[in-house]
Regions:
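Non-heme Fe(II)/2-oxoglutarate
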Residues: 1-72, 78, 89
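Intrinsically disordered, low-complexity regions enriched in small/polar residues
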Residues: 12-15, 32, 41, 45, ...
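Catalytic core of non-heme Fe(II) oxygenases with the double-stranded beta-helix
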Residues: 76, 83-150, 155-158, 165-177
């Protein structure tokens, strides 16, 4: 299914990848074993990089390419995110400089969230918590204001960026709303 994303919005691709129980087990185990704490009000949100030699990288990359959203965009900085039970919600933010992500650019950069487990979620300003089931993929434009959700249970999910040549994303930086 190929589609375009509206400005500043998001699109959910239902069951982008059909995960096997073994794939889920390996991804969750890898995330829990290798993750380090990241930007969050507590130390319960962690991440670990997924490079192109990891078994899941090509599976996910191929599925994402088939949607058409990667056209004119470059997949970068793929990570597994691991939220421990009790993880607090992040502050609302942009992943890209909002002064650079405008309607005047040819193609906007995007963020991507892929659910390895049911009840994966992301807070989107004006929408609240947007839930994903296992295998669902949420693609959101760089000017979509969002926040990592609070979790009262452990959750592992994949996150990556779809960068564009016109806008340089600062690694590990956010712009608060």
């Amino acid at each position: 299914m190929k589609s375009k994303i509206k400005n500043g919005e998001y699109k959910i691709f239902k069951t982008l990848v059909q995960l096997t129980p073994q794939m889920c087990k390996e991804l969750k185990s890898y995330a829990k074993k290798h993750s380090e704490s990241i930007f969050n009000p507590d130390y319960n949100r962690l991440q670990t990089p997924i490079n192109n030699t990891h078994f899941f990288y090509t599976i996910f990359e191929d599925a994402l390419i088939k949607t058409g959203v990667t056209r004119g965009r470059i997949i970068n900085d793929m990570v597994l995110l691991y939220s421990k039970k009790g993880c607090k919600k992040q502050a609302y933010h942009y992943d890209y400089d909002p002064d650079k992500v405008t309607n005047n650019i040819r193609r906007k950069p995007c963020g991507v969230l892929f659910a390895i487990e049911d009840n994966t979620k992301l807070n989107i300003l004006g929408e609240g918590e947007v839930y994903l089931n296992q295998g669902d993929c949420l693609v959101f434009e760089g000017d979509c204001v969002h926040a990592g959700s609070a979790y009262n249970y452990d959750n592992v999910r994949l996150h990556t960026y779809l960068d564009v040549i016109d806008i340089k994303r600062s690694e590990n930086s956010t712009w608060f709303y």
